[in-house]
């Protein structure tokens, strides 16, 4: 997050909060992260991408919409998609991750999703013009009062 985002934006270090990946107790790390979010009054802007199976964050298909930050087992598809961050070596990709839950994402005041490429066209159509279902986690964003989808022509070609 620092290398790809925080080092490139004008933000105070004390305003940056991430789940503590060094905490051996996943439930405690997630609870503390949720406490931080609540203590600062929630999230103003949630920036999201869209996974090939409709996941947002690491909320994979089938995850309950009512969850806050929690630890998840990553699907093989998500592991494969993230190997690019590990020099292409799938064996180096973690098999679990902390993720902000759908409940917390939906409580953000504004949600912005950025999509690009033809590989996202079908899932964009399914997520935003299909039924709201846990099988396509991003579909819940149809219900958000202030959601914006930004994408290139290819990603938006089917809508």
Regions found by a protein language model. Give the residues of each.
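Ligand-binding beta-strand-loop-alpha-helix segment within the catalytic cores
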Residues: 1-45
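Solvent-exposed alpha-helices and their adjacent loops that cap or buttress functional pockets
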Residues: 9-11, 37-41, 65, 97, ...
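Short beta-strand segments
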Residues: 19-20, 47-50, 113-116, 150
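Short, flexible loop segments at the rims of nucleotide/cofactor-binding pockets, characterized by
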Residues: 23-25, 88-94, 127-129
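A short secondary-structure junction signal
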Residues: 28-31, 57-62, 67-68, 123-127
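A glycine-rich beta-strand to alpha-helix segment
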Residues: 35-63
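Class I SAM-dependent methyltransferase SAM-binding "motif I" and its flanking Rossmann-like core
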Residues: 57-102
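ATP/nucleoside-binding phosphotransfer catalytic cores, i.e., glycine-rich phosphate-binding loops
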Residues: 103, 107-159
């Amino acid at each position: 997050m620092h290398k790809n985002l925080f080092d490139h934006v004008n933000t105070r270090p004390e305003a940056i909060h991430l789940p503590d990946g060094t905490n051996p107790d996943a439930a405690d790390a997630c609870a503390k992260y949720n406490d931080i979010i609540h203590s600062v009054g929630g999230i103003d802007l949630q920036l999201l991408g869209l996974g090939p199976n409709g996941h947002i964050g690491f909320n994979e298909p089938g995850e309950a919409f009512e969850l806050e930050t929690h630890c998840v087992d990553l699907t093989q598809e998500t592991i494969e998609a993230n190997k690019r961050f590990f020099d292409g070596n799938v064996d180096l990709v973690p098999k679990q991750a902390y993720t902000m839950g759908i409940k917390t994402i939906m409580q953000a005041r504004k949600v912005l999703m950025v999509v690009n490429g033809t590989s996202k066209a079908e899932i964009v159509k399914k997520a935003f013009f299909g039924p709201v279902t846990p099988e396509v986690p991003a579909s819940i964003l149809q219900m958000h009062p202030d959601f914006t989808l930004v994408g290139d022509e290819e990603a938006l070609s089917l809508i």
